[in-house]
């Protein structure tokens, strides 16, 4: 375990993803915990993580999480399903700050949401092949799980393409087998995918409930910070600070971050981690 001075409640929350997808989680945390400061790192130089070998994903995630801990973050949020599947156990053994991931929160929400017991899961190749979702759903034996990889979705989001006939056609191809299985609940098992929720909903139909882990993850962040007496005190630090950083092209990351997050993004820092 890496031992550092225990951060106080005024320390930032560290969030990372392979790119812009984790901004969906950051946005929800900002909305639900408006007094918390945040450092967000998008590893665009090495992402997307989905097609990479698990060992490589673990290597990239380790490097970024180490930096966030070194910079005094009081909590690490792995805002990437592929990295959560590859790195969660290592992270919780390595760091003495709380580590929150995005897979279990989505599973909890899907189990509560389904009406017919048939749940679909879509994600990157790495996430689907890891079996992480399937393993967690196994704790609810009444749930029938159908999984499908949607490898091209992340690339579209990273290029800022979130609607249009081309992406809809691709979505329909990916999702048709899940429709055929009669799923009534679909887990968006990649933090990029909520940015395609309009297209995915159109392809699946209005009768299917889409589950994003962002809302449930933010609830976990609130609960764990509260349990550890780490919630920021707005009377002591009324104005939170936000740092959004990219290991790759900062200009493209800046454009997408401002589009997805709005005015909270004032400057993008190029991080050479």
Curated annotation (Swiss-Prot):
Residues annotated for substrate binding in this entry: 17-18, 49-50, 81-82, 191-192
UniProt protein name: Glutamate racemase
Upper lineage: Bacteria, Bacillati, Actinomycetota, Actinomycetes, Mycobacteriales
Top-rank lineage group of the source organism: Bacteria
Enzyme class: isomerase
Any Gene Ontology biological process: cell wall organization
Entry annotated with the keyword Glycoprotein: no
Protein EC: 5.1.1.3
Catalytic activity: L-glutamate = D-glutamate
Source organism: Corynebacterium efficiens (strain DSM 44549 / YS-314 / AJ 12310 / JCM 11189 / NBRC 100395)
């Amino acid at each position: 375990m890496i031992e550092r001075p225990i951060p106080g409640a005024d320390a930032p929350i560290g969030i990372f993803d392979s790119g812009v997808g984790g901004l969906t989680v950051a946005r929800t945390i900002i909305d639900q915990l408006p007094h918390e400061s945040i450092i967000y790192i998008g590893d665009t130089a090495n992402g997307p993580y989905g097609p990479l070998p698990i060992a490589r994903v673990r290597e990239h995630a380790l490097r970024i999480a180490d930096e966030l801990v070194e910079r005094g973050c009081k909590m690490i949020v792995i805002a990437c399903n592929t990295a959560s599947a590859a790195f969660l156990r290592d992270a919780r053994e390595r760091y003495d700050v709380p580590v929150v991931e995005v897979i279990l929160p989505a599973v909890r929400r899907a189990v509560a949401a389904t009406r017919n017991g048939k749940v679909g899961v879509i994600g990157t190749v790495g996430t689907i092949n890891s079996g992480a979702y399937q393993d967690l759903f196994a704790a609810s034996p009444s749930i029938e799980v159908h999984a499908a990889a949607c490898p091209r979705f992340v690339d579209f989001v990273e290029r800022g393409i979130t609607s249009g006939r081309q992406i809809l056609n691709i979505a329909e191809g990916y999702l048709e087998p899940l429709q055929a299985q009669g799923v009534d609940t679909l887990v968006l098992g990649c933090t990029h995918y909520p940015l395609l929720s309009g297209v995915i909903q159109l392809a699946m139909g209005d009768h299917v409930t889409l589950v994003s882990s962002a809302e449930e993850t933010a609830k976990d962040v609130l609960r764990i910070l509260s349990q550890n007496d780490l919630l920021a005190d707005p009377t002591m630090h009324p104005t939170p600070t936000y740092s959004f950083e990219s290991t790759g092209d900062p200009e493209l990351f800046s454009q997408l971050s401002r589009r997805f997050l709005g005015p909270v993004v004032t400057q993008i820092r190029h991080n050479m981690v």
